[in-house]
Amino acid sequence: MKYPTVSFRWGVRRSHVCAWLLLLLCVGCATPSRTLFVSPVGNDTNPGTQNKPFATLPRAIEQVRELKRSEEPCGPVTVFLRGGTYELREPIIFTPADSGTSNAPVTYASFPGEHAILSGGKRLTVNWRPTPGKPYWQLDVPSARDGKWTFHSLIVNGESRMRARTPNWGEKVLRAEGREPGGDARQALRYYAGDVNPAWRNPTDIDVVLLCSWTPTIHRIKEIVPETRSIRFFSAHSRTVDAWEPHFRYYLSNVFEALDQPGEWYLDRPTGTLYYYPLPGEDLAKAEVVAPVMKSRMIEFAGDPGKGQFIAHLHLRDLSFRYVDGDMDRYNGVYRQGHMFLASALSAHGLRNASFERCEFTQLGEYALELADGCRDVTVRQCHIWDIGAGALQLGVTDLATLKANEPALAVRNLVIDNNCIHRLGTIWHGSYGIVNRFASQTQITHNEIFDTHWDAIGLDARWDWKGEKFSSGNVVAYNHLHHLGLRYHTDAAGVYQFGPLDTHIHHNLIHDTFAYPYICGFAGVYLDEQSRNAVVENNLVYNTDWYAYFQHKGMDNLFRNNIGAFARDGLIWRGGLNAAWTSNYLEACRNIYIASNDVAISQAWQPGLKPPVLHSNLYHTLAQSTPLTFAGKRFAEWQAQGQDANSVIADPGCRNPAAFDFSLRQDAPAIRAIGFAPFDDEIRKAGLTGDPAWRELPRKYTPRTPTATWTSDDLAKLVAFDLDFNLMKDGEAPGVFQSSEQTGAGFAVTSEIAGTHGPKCLK
């Protein structure tokens, strides 16, 4: 059987020597070590030897427990899984009984030179047939018709495919006319004529994806009402549908009539028919087509830290975890930042002194891995996490009240997330973090490369007040390479984003090419949101961002020092959210270099507040030599006259070739002597993956998705102007597209007192 995932080959080769050394070391241990074997062609009645292996992982886990319970001393235990696919139908659950010790750890790994896949999916038969008169093919899935099996993901030749949607990926999404007239403002929308067809097949299987500013929601259609051009949802949003924009964005997923692009598919549940539009050159008689059977979770590490029950010294290496579906029914309509209500395919509670190394996580419907309450001293290193329905990693505790009730047992500390390749995230849940560190302290997030995701690559989360900061402190985000983020779906985001943590150190990160939805906020390089306190942001390189390079919103006592920013839409840095309740919103920014491609050094004015921001000793430069730099619309001298940027200069910093994104400094660079800038050229080259060349070059094998097209203000004005239907409005309702001056007493509203040209109502 062919496994096309090139991402795993590096790990198998590199693990050969380590695994064989492990075998040799086991022979010489003072306490006898044990090695068990599992094979897809084994038998669970076998003794688990190399010649007579078990057939399933649960049987091997059971045998490890028996070894631990035996009276004879037991040394390290290694379970080798021979190459092939192991289909799971129930989650595997590890308990404290599966623990090892510091001298006798338990390890589950692929056999040296082979590739073991733990699969929550089922391979579909090759009995595909062409659909008459159509470019797609179809397959009977009787269990879908019987209601026994439904799935929201389809994988063909190792890559996930997209459910039929309108508009197609990359096209401008739809715009709503607004709320349903007289309807629930959280549970319905009014569509523009021609965008929705009430006669579509199986309309109650269609999902409406509302693209809010930073967190989208998914709503199953309850009914389409053509008389009012309304779509009503089964589930209500926690806010009004137009909370972010009057003509908010959305698209429709799982629409049979939208099956018009290669790579799209549709499952007709009532008839039990799966339709798929093959990519050019795909032969369904030979293709490996898999649909997930398992939902949300594949493996659980079920400690109970509140009762002092932990799983310890357990290691997973060189394994592949694939094909778990997202539970779109359970989470329909749920809203929360980062989709942190979602489950993870692998979920750990009370896991300690453990590791996941050189593993692959792919085609998983929600998050990939969660290290939750009570997890400590766990390492995730050199894993390839890609093609995921939501995000890669959830770290820490979600609920602050639960944590505070038993903090000594439940606190999450000392996690290491190092040297992982993470990309193509949010294929279902677009507003997901790449890595999110919730209530967890002393986490090290280093040397990861994260790209091709809709929202924040790395997030640190300790809530919107000061109550949680001590439970998320002392975290380090360093030497990460974060790029091609946003895809123009979302905004108010960043490569590194945090709200609430204390004493975070963010350094030596390379962040570039962010793409924001352009009409609400933007997509920064580093963003310190509310209650971020005592953070140090230094020695980072940020360029090509759709907002500021660096940004603070309602933070306190944070330092931005010795960073480089370049070619940001709105300049080097800004402090937002200053108001009467946030007069302590304070930062210091010094010894930073900013290189513009336009005339904007800083785009907005800085209000003083109780503690004014301290900008000093910065260097500004623009490649647009014919246009002077502006600071909140002012010239540099005026800006400094307001007390800003003392000892700062406008000068060429001495970068070798900034137009080609080479920001390394010459030895005689003016920035060194003018502002005391400390070059970090050698260190920033270390950002991203480390190790052998094949691993470091892995990201270059994957092309990020193209950012989606966006509506221009002219596009939207034309849409609104030419689609006003007063007959769908109530008497007295004022169309949102018009404005009037209350000072002059002017006003307008829909009325039925005077007949309109095309119906009983008009505008008065």
PLM features: what roles do these ranges have?
Residues H16-G28:
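Bacterial N-terminal signal peptides
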Residues V27-T35:
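Bacterial Sec-dependent signal peptides at the C-terminal "C-region" and cleavage site
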Residues V38, Y108, L118, L393, ...:
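Bulky hydrophobic/aromatic "packing anchor" residues in well-ordered structure
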Residues P40-D44, D725-A734:
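Short polar catalytic/cofactor-binding loops
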Residues P91-I93, T101, I299, G326-A348, ...:
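Glycine- and acidic/polar-rich repeat regions and solenoidal domains
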